[in-house]
């Protein structure tokens, strides 16, 4: 039986600042993230697939050194649209952000993807 293990990338500077870091912001891992990831142990795998984002390829390379990395564009993170690379403090007072919050995150990101579009793209990959 095929077993699929999904792993989120290690921490980036934008993550530390609680920013919406998605498809439009290609930033590397923080130095300490690499050290933390290197201490983790994962089972032997047959194949490694990753988003083309540098933080994802770095994470895969640290966790599975020596394994061929298969890049799948459709696995890239969500397109946060006008929220990209901003945190909740910077979005305070933004009517689109407040509408999105009030919807429980169900509305599409303004200028970005909806949850359904993001899911469909990832599943296609």
Language-model regions: role of each:
Residues 55-58, 95, 124:
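Short Gly/charged-rich anion-binding patches and loops
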Residues 2-4, 8-67:
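Active-site-proximal alpha-helix that buttresses catalytic centers in soluble enzyme cores
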Residues 39, 124-125:
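Solvent-exposed, charged/polar functional surfaces in cytosolic regulatory/catalytic domains
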Residues 63-121:
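Phosphate-handling substructures
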């Amino acid at each position: 039986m095929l077993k699929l293990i999904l792993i989120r990338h290690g921490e980036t500077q934008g993550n530390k600042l609680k920013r919406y870091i998605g498809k439009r912001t290609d930033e590397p891992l923080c130095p300490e993230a690499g050290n933390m990831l290197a201490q983790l142990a994962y089972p032997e795998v047959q194949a490694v697939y990753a988003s083309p984002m540098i933080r994802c390829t770095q994470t895969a390379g640290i966790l599975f050194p020596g394994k061929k990395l298969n890049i799948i564009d459709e696995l890239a993170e969500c397109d946060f649209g006008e929220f990209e690379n901003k945190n909740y403090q910077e979005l305070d007072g933004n009517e689109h952000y407040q509408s999105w919050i009030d919807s429980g995150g169900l509305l599409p990101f303004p200028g970005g993807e909806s949850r359904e579009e993001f899911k469909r793209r990832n599943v296609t990959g």
